[in-house]
C-alpha cells in the first residue's frame, strides 16, 4: 500500500459499499458509507465520494472530482464537475438534471425540508454566477440543514467547477 507522494492517504472506503464488476478506484480516493458503484465505472485519482451515492454503469469520474452525499449519477455519465449533495447528474459532460427526490424520501427527510431544498436549488442556480446567487440567499434557508449542506459543499472548494443545470 503506497500513496502518491503528495498525499498520506491511499484509499479510504466506508462501510456497506457495493462495487460491481470492473469498477476501478484509483489512488488517493475517499469513498463514504453505503455507496453503490455499478459495472465498468472507473474513478480517477483523488476522487471524493460522500455517503449514500449511487453511480450508474459505464460512467466515469475524472480525477479530483467530489460527489456530494446522496447524489445519484446516471448511467453512462462523464463526471467532470463536482456534483452537489442530493444532486441528480447525467450526460456525457455531466449536468444537473435536478435533485435526487426519491433518495431523499427513502431517507425519510421531511417534505417541508425537501420542498425548501428544491426552492433553494432554483435560487442557487438562478444564474451562472453561483457565488453571487449564494450571497443573495444568505440566511434565507438557515433552518434547512439540507440547504446548508449544499451551500457548504459549494463553498468548500471554489477552484473546482460545480455541475449545474443546462440553461
Regions found by a protein language model. Name each.
Residues 1-6, 10:
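Single conserved hydrophobic/aromatic residue that forms the stacking wall/gate
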Residues 2, 18, 36, 54, ...:
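N-terminal alpha-helical segment
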Residues 14-15, 20-21, 26-27, 32-33, ...:
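Left-handed beta-helix
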Residues 92-167:
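Terminal amphipathic alpha-helical/low-complexity segments used for targeting or macromolecular assembly
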Amino acid at each position: 500500500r503506497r500513496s502518491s507522494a503528495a498525499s498520506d492517504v491511499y484509499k479510504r472506503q466506508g462501510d456497506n459499499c457495493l462495487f460491481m464488476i470492473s469498477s476501478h478506484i484509483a489512488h488517493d480516493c475517499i469513498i463514504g458509507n453505503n455507496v453503490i458503484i455499478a459495472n465498468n465505472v472507473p474513478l480517477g485519482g483523488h476522487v471524493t465520494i460522500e455517503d449514500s451515492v449511487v453511480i450508474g454503469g459505464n460512467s466515469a469520474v475524472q480525477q479530483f472530482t467530489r460527489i456530494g452525499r446522496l447524489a445519484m449519477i446516471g448511467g453512462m455519465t462523464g463526471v467532470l464537475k463536482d456534483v452537489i449533495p442530493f444532486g441528480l447528474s447525467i450526460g456525457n459532460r455531466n449536468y444537473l438534471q435536478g435533485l435526487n427526490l426519491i433518495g431523499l424520501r427513502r431517507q425519510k427527510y421531511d417534505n417541508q425540508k425537501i420542498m425548501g431544498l428544491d426552492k433553494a436549488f432554483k435560487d442557487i442556480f438562478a444564474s451562472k454566477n453561483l457565488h453571487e446567487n449564494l450571497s443573495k440567499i444568505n440566511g434565507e434557508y438557515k433552518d434547512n440543514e439540507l440547504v446548508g449542506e449544499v451551500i457548504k459543499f459549494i463553498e468548500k472548494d471554489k477552484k473546482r467547477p460545480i455541475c449545474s443545470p443546462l440553461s
